[in-house]
């Protein structure tokens, strides 16, 4: 992934995030991602997710795409005791590893994991959510927005990672399916009058959309 910010700025933000919260479990999850080239949001974006969730008093979070629980770690910190984070991932191994990590971090009681298709898992849940977070395969982003936008409470948030796609969304010559899907997704979010949205150019771009109507 190409960096959107200068490397020195990226490292500065990471150092600040590390100084705010340290956890050997988090270190282990990050080391695994680095060793196996597994995509995680990283500590600076993780901190952003936690801040966003705390800022609206989120108690119920739906994740569309969870991997082995890295982003769920941050949301679970935010929702507090009695809050819930519903995770989805197609791989049973990821679900088992998420449980192992989050149990050690003391957060597993706030998490439920659905193995299988993210949107099918979402459809099986009842009611609205304070936050829906999207980090599935990029060609699925438009459908995730269409589903999520209907089930976020007034004052709730839609959050989505990788929406700048290493800058490829701004390259007209790039016609890859994943790039075009993210462009469509971003236009759909921006055009929805029920939401006020912006993209934070942190790491690979984070869509932040607040439901106002």
Set out the residue ranges of the language-model regions.
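A short alpha-helical cap/connector motif
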Residues: 1-131, 138-159, 163-213
């Amino acid at each position: 992934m190409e960096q959107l910010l200068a490397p020195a700025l990226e490292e500065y933000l990471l150092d600040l995030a590390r100084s705010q919260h340290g956890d050997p479990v988090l270190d282990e999850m990050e080391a695994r991602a680095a060793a196996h080239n597994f995509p995680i949001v990283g500590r600076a974006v993780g901190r952003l997710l936690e801040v966003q969730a705390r800022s609206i008093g989120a108690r119920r979070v739906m994740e569309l795409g969870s991997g082995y629980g890295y982003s769920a770690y941050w949301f679970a910190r935010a929702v507090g005791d009695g809050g819930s984070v519903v995770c989805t991932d197609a791989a049973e191994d990821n679900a088992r590893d998420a449980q192992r990590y989050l149990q050690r971090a003391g957060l597993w009681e706030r998490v439920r994991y659905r193995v299988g298709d993210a949107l099918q898992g979402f459809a099986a849940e009842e009611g609205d959510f304070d936050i829906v977070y999207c980090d599935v395969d990029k060609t699925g982003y438009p459908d995730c927005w269409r589903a999520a936008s209907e089930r976020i409470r007034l004052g709730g948030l839609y959050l989505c990672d990788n929406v700048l796609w290493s800058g490829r969304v701004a390259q007209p010559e790039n016609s890859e399916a994943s790039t075009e899907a993210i462009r469509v997704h971003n236009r759909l979010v921006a055009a929805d009058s029920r939401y006020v949205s912006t993209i934070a150019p942190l790491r690979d771009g984070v869509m932040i959309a607040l439901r106002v109507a």
